[in-house]
Every structure is written in structure tokens, then in C-alpha cells.
Amino acid sequence: MKKYKIIYADPPWRYARSKVQGAAEKHYPTMSIEELCALPVKEIADKDCILFLWATFPQLKEALQLIKAWGFTYKSVAFVWLKQNRKSPTWFYGLGFWTRGNAEICLLATKGHPKRQSNKVHQFIISPVEQHSKKPDITREKILALMGDLPRIELFARQHTPGWDVWGNEIKSDKRFAGKEV
């Protein structure tokens, strides 16, 4: 099985409050934390690998649990996406659970000793929201600038990106992973 030095993932988190407006379940199938933890990500991670994992603040505890289950150690927040509205440069605000949410975070975790290639990559991503849960394309560019042109895969991918292997239920996957095309 091919090993990757970069794993980029935007899991389809299942929320306890699935009836709220904008709930992920209305847009795509979600997975429980147990289902996510059971994915054999350890099998595709190189001995020196970096994981970029999108998480929302209500799922932060589960994201840290998932990082550990996949064999990684949490290090930092790689990126903070400050969301703008689609049609104007004003800030986008979701309903939120307590306060009106805007930012989403991409956590950084490592296995072994991956090496950073650049110290010039900034944490903030200021970009409009697009389709539900789609992350800014510039994230992949920032990952490559930070880590270099290494073997990489995007889990739960929605699109094909040159140079990236992909796995997800919304696209034709390149590989087999967890008994499914990847």
C-alpha cells in the first residue's frame, strides 16, 4: 500500500444537533467519531507524516481524539479560515451553538519527524464560503508551500487536484482505502 507524507482531511463530522439549519446531514452522509477513528489511516501514513485536519470548534474534542486514533500527535493550528460572504467582502456568520461562528480551523498533527520546507506560510486564510463545507482551494497550495512536493492524499475529497491522490464518496477515487476506492 502506498505511504503518504502528507494527509489532508476534511471529515464529514456528525453533530449531535443534526436538525439545525445548515446541518451537514442535509448535504452529504456523515460519520460518527467511532467510524472515523476506525479508518485505517495508520496504514497509509509514512513513518514521517503530517496530517492537516479540518475541524469546527464544537467538534474540537473529537478532532483531537481522531488525531490520536490515526496515530498522530497534535502540534498546532495550521490554518484559520476567516469566512467571507460569497458576493461581498463582508464577514460570513453562521448561527453557531453559542456565538455567531465565522472561523474554522485546520489542525496540524505529526507522526515521526516530518520537516517543514518554508517558514513563510501564514496561518490565516481569508476566503469566501462556497458550497456547503467546501474548504478554500488555497489550503492545498499553502500545504505544498509549507511541506514541499511530497507524496500526498486528500481524504474525503470533493475534487481532483493535480499532484494529489484522492479518496471520498463525492468523486472517483484514485486508490483503495478502508475497503473502498481511494
Residue ranges of each PLM-predicted region?
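Class I S-adenosyl-L-methionine-dependent methyltransferase catalytic core
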Residues: M1-V182
